[in-house]
From Swiss-Prot:
GO terms for biological process: lignin biosynthetic process; positive regulation of DNA-templated transcription; regulation of secondary cell wall biogenesis; response to light stimulus. InterPro entries: Homeodomain-like_sf, Myb_dom, Myb_TF_plants, SANT/Myb. Signal peptide: none annotated. It holds the Pfam family Myb_DNA-binding. GO terms for cellular component: nucleus. This is Transcription factor MYB58. Expressed in leaves. Specifically expressed in fibers and vessels undergoing secondary wall thickening, especially in inflorescence stems. Residues 263-274 have a biased composition (Low complexity). Transcriptional activator that binds DNA to the AC cis-elements 5'-ACCTACC-3', 5'-ACCAACC-3' and 5'-ACCTAAC-3' of promoters and specifically activates lignin biosynthetic genes during secondary wall formation mediated by SND1.
Amino acid sequence: MGKGRAPCCDKTKVKRGPWSHDEDLKLISFIHKNGHENWRSLPKQAGLLRCGKSCRLRWINYLRPDVKRGNFSAEEEDTIIKLHQSFGNKWSKIASKLPGRTDNEIKNVWHTHLKKRLSSETNLNADEAGSKGSLNEEENSQESSPNASMSFAGSNISSKDDDAQISQMFEHILTYSEFTGMLQEVDKPELLEMPFDLDPDIWSFIDGSDSFQQPENRALQESEEDEVDKWFKHLESELGLEENDNQQQQQQHKQGTEDEHSSSLLESYELLIH
């Protein structure tokens, strides 16, 4: 491995700590006469028991004539913030863009003041963004609620329209059914009303036409009826019912003659009275 850069001085033989007024005067007078081309050899040439790095920092940060004293202005702070976004913690580059300001001062003002201010501003912006987002959500909800009510009202109106359409459909169906019923009544064949005072010969003619159309069936039916009558007469003769029927017929005939005789007597009597 390489040894690296050699130290500028022996740390055991140099003085540390704050600078005295005499040390500041020696450094200022030497730089005004000889300049500061080589900081490594400057302490020995100026008669200072200090390190070259310590002399450089003392001159740059405190003793040079163009060093600004006091607080940083608002413009300087904004410049430091912008440069820090570009260069980061490279304080020497930032100091080169700000004449009269040292890198040590810039670093101190950044850590003590500007960094805290940026963090507070970012938190404030985040809070504002959250509040704006909540306001936008509330506005959207308020806008959506009238739309929802409008949609609900529209649904009610549409349901009412649907009910009206359904009722109209039912009415149309009923009227159509009534109309079809009327058409069926019109299309029914008219029944001929037969007069009650028809000539009895018509019915005999109809019966005759039936008998003419079916002579064989009529003859077969009459033969069957004759057979049934013969069978009933045979049964009455076997049971003795035929004699009883003859006696009843004779009694009825006798009673009828008696009634006719009595009625004729009454009529003659009435004629005599009158």
